[in-house]
């Protein structure tokens, strides 16, 4: 009987030691979590929001500027830890290509649905500057409404930075027979798009520009042009002719495959993060409308929305 008791006691001690060891192994690493920053406001503010959440949990954080397409290779190689705004339409292919090579994992999907498309400020439609909009065929009859000093008499279409979509929009306009009356110009940054939108609004002139939702413009009055419906394979890169619009899509999160092991608590929190259209629009508006710095915008958003983000940190709930 005494031997049995000793065996049970020894087993209990062993289990306790394993449990303690497991807890020690489960401690998040002191190695910094590397968060990338790109070139649009919500992404940068959210980087600092997420970094602030990680820091509140005791993690160390480092921010690095990164190319929005190449970042998935950086995650795969371990140079960057996460990506928190993986837009399906623009970055989905790069994301899945990196996953297929190994080293990148899908860390979940935000509540917000996305759309990345060309459009016009609402006053363009309200004032009937180009009758028939938002139907794309209206563009055939009013290129002069969108002409600028540098467009050679053609209508100008202001695309995002070329690194975002490459030749997607030029290919679309050619496939739809609009290229003879319109020229595609690439903006240097998201800020350049907002500056052009503000200038056009002040002057009351027509402007076609790339935009996306969720964004601060959701509440500011912006209408997306209704191009032919997107179908799988319609884009040139997928074997089609390019005569289609953009799909509505998801907004995902990506992480290096080692993140769950090196920072189990931070990864669990990251996997639970799910921001809404309203959340993301607020983050962008603090910079693009209220003119705050990205860092200050993140601090304000965190202070104003503790009820949102603290739930992400409650492990096991």
Range-by-range predicted roles:
Residues 47, 66-102, 196, 216-221:
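Pocket-flanking alpha-helical
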Residues 103-158:
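A conserved helix-loop-strand patch within extracytoplasmic ligand-binding domains
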Residues 28-42, 59-64, 154-158, 270:
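Short, well-ordered beta-strand elements
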Residues 116-128, 248-262, 285-286:
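A bilobed periplasmic-binding-protein/Venus flytrap-type ligand-binding module shared by bacterial periplasmic
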Residues 24-34, 54-55, 146-154, 308-317:
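Immediate post-signal peptide segment of exported/extracytoplasmic ligand-binding proteins
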Residues 267-317:
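C-terminal functional modules
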Residues 40-41, 59-76, 184-196:
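Short helix-initiation/N-cap motifs at beta->coil->alpha
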Residues 80-84, 158-236:
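Ligand-binding pocket segment of bilobal, Venus flytrap-like solute-binding proteins
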């Amino acid at each position: 009987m005494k031997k049995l008791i000793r065996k049970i006691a020894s087993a209990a001690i062993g289990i306790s030691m394993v449990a303690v060891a497991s807890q020690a192994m489960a401690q998040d690493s002191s190695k910094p979590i590397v968060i990338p920053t790109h070139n649009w406001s919500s992404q940068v503010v959210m980087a600092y929001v997420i970094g602030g959440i990680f820091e509140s949990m005791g993690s160390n954080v480092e921010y690095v500027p990164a190319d929005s397409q190449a970042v998935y290779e950086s995650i795969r190689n371990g140079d960057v830890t996460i990506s928190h705004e993986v837009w399906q339409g623009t970055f989905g292919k790069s994301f899945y290509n990196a996953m297929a090579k190994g080293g990148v994992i899908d860390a979940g999907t935000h509540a917000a649905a996305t759309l990345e498309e060309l459009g016009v400020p609402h006053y363009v439609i309200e004032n009937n500057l180009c009758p028939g909009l938002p139907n794309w065929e209206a563009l055939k009859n009013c290129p002069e409404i969108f002409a600028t000093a540098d467009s050679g008499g053609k209508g100008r279409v202001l695309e995002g930075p070329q690194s975002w979509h490459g030749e997607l929009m030029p290919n679309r306009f050619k496939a739809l027979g609009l290229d003879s009356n319109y020229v595609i110009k690439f903006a240097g940054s998201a800020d350049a798009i907002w500056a052009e939108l503000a200038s056009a609004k002040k002057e009351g002139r027509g402007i076609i520009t790339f935009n996306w939702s969720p964004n601060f413009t959701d509440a500011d009055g912006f209408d997306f042009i209704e191009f032919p419906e997107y179908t799988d394979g319609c884009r040139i890169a997928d074997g089609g002719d390019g005569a289609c619009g953009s799909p509505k899509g998801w907004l995902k999160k990506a992480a290096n495959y080692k993140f769950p092991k090196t920072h189990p608590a931070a990864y669990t929190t990251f996997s639970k993060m799910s921001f809404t259209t309203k959340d993301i629009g607020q983050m962008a508006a603090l910079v693009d409308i209220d003119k705050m710095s990205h860092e200050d915008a993140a601090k304000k958003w965190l202070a104003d929305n503790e009820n949102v983000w603290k739930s992400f940190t409650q492990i096991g709930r």
